[in-house]
């Protein structure tokens, strides 16, 4: 009986917490950026995958959805390991940082005016860290 109560309580709490998560695709700016990734963030398939994850993660970071942030960190971790399996950035210990290094080296960083108009502190922070850590020559 206690197990059933615990399971129902867990399911109820999960539904309530997921019900509070804001849908990024109902946000006009986010939806437009996501649909136009190829134009805004040109690059290869890896660049597009990474930026999709970063956009989603940034949206949830801006909206304080910690569970969703963890999900996208997990996705970036897996992708960083895949990139390393292919022989890139082997000296890096953090797989999420591998995706950041890949993005910095091979992908497009949007113009500052686009970032300002997008109004995402988390996304701006991501690109500012790329500019600081991995300046383009």
PLM regions and their residue ranges:
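Generic detector of N-terminal low-structure segments
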Residues: 12-14, 61, 91
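Short N-proximal segments of mature Sec-exported proteins
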Residues: 29, 34-84
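Alpha-helical segment of the N-proximal tetratricopeptide repeat
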Residues: 20-28
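Extracellular/secretory pathway and lumenal proteins
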Residues: 21, 51, 110-113
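Classical Sec-dependent N-terminal signal peptides that target proteins to the secretory pathway
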Residues: 1-20
